[in-house]
């Protein structure tokens, strides 16, 4: 039995609030249950040095947590003068995941930065950031299209979404909250496209190694869950 009472294949309630910020070209407040992340997409008319004069653009990401996003206040990383390893790992994952569905040549020599700021954390912040980040990216590209800068359907090749799965109390479960994640026997994150392509899989056994059969169960849960998330993304951008 899961602490939340959810079924093994039941995700938390997911919602997207588009255009949350009046300043950013694209923005979305994404909620996976009690995990809330503000994703903003900012356009800059420049590219990283290694892409200059190539005709290609770039999509990158930064990730952070508000000091009281968790049960106890955390010190701001800016106050410490450097980012932690976890932060760097997560923001690179977000950037890779979004670039997987972007035609950088069609974007042109421009950079879009996704800022994913966790307002409240209850497990799955990286997967929420990727899933909500896609919405913010889409709205940024629509903003560009309205100004005759690009065509969205040429730049954005597919949807991308992410979900966590794990083995909790000897059962394969989807979308772990913090209570489950902190005591899971196996923890994995899956990033996939709308067409079912695998972008990235991160899986770790916290104690006893997991079996191929358990991994197959997690993969099945993830495929179904990401299918649901992509359907919710489509519903959000149609509204």
From Swiss-Prot:
Record EC number: 2.7.7.56
Pfam families hit by this protein: RNase_PH (PF01138), RNase_PH_C (PF03725)
Keywords tagged on the record: Nucleotidyltransferase, RNA-binding, rRNA processing, Transferase, tRNA processing, tRNA-binding
Superkingdom of source: Bacteria
Catalytic activity: tRNA(n+1) + phosphate = tRNA(n) + a ribonucleoside 5'-diphosphate
GO biological process assignments: rRNA catabolic process; rRNA processing; tRNA processing
The keyword Repeat belongs to this UniProt entry's keyword annotation: no
Protein residues bound to phosphate: 86, 124-126
Enzyme class: transferase
GO molecular function list: 3'-5'-RNA exonuclease activity; tRNA binding; tRNA nucleotidyltransferase activity
Role noted for this protein: Phosphorolytic 3'-5' exoribonuclease that plays an important role in tRNA 3'-end maturation. Removes nucleotide residues following the 3'-CCA terminus of tRNAs; can also add nucleotides to the ends of RNA molecules by using nucleoside diphosphates as substrates, but this may not be physiologically important. Probably plays a role in initiation of 16S rRNA degradation (leading to ribosome degradation) during starvation.
NCBIfam families, alphabetized: RNasePH (TIGR01966)
Subunit structure: Homohexameric ring arranged as a trimer of dimers.
Similarity comment: Belongs to the RNase PH family.
UniProt protein name: Ribonuclease PH
Organism: Rhizobium etli (strain CIAT 652)
């Amino acid at each position: 039995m899961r602490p939340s009472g959810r079924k093994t294949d039941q995700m938390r309630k997911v919602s997207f609030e588009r255009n949350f910020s009046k300043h950013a070209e694209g923005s979305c407040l994404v909620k996976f249950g009690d995990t809330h992340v503000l994703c903003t997409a900012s356009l800059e008319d420049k590219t990283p040095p290694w892409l200059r004069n190539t005709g290609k653009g770039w999509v990158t990401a930064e990730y952070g947590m508000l000091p009281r996003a968790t049960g106890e206040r955390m010190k701001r990383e800016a106050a410490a003068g450097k980012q932690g390893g976890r932060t760097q790992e997560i923001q690179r994952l977000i950037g890779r995941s979004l670039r997987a569905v972007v035609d950088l040549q069609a974007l042109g020599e421009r950079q879009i930065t996704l800022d994913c700021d966790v307002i409240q954390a209850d497990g799955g912040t990286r997967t929420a950031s990727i899933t909500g980040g896609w919405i913010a990216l889409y709205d940024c590209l629509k903003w560009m299209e309205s100004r005759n800068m690009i065509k969205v359907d040429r730049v954005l090749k597919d949807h991308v979404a992410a979900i966590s799965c794990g083995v909790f109390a000897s059962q394969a479960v989807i979308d772990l909250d913090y209570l489950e994640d902190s005591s899971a026997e196996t923890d994995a994150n899956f990033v996939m496209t709308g067409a079912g392509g695998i972008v990235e899989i991160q899986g770790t056994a916290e104690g006893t190694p997991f079996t191929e059969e358990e991994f197959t169960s997690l993969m099945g849960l993830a495929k179904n869950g990401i299918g649901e998330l992509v359907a919710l993304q489509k519903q959000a951008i149609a509204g």
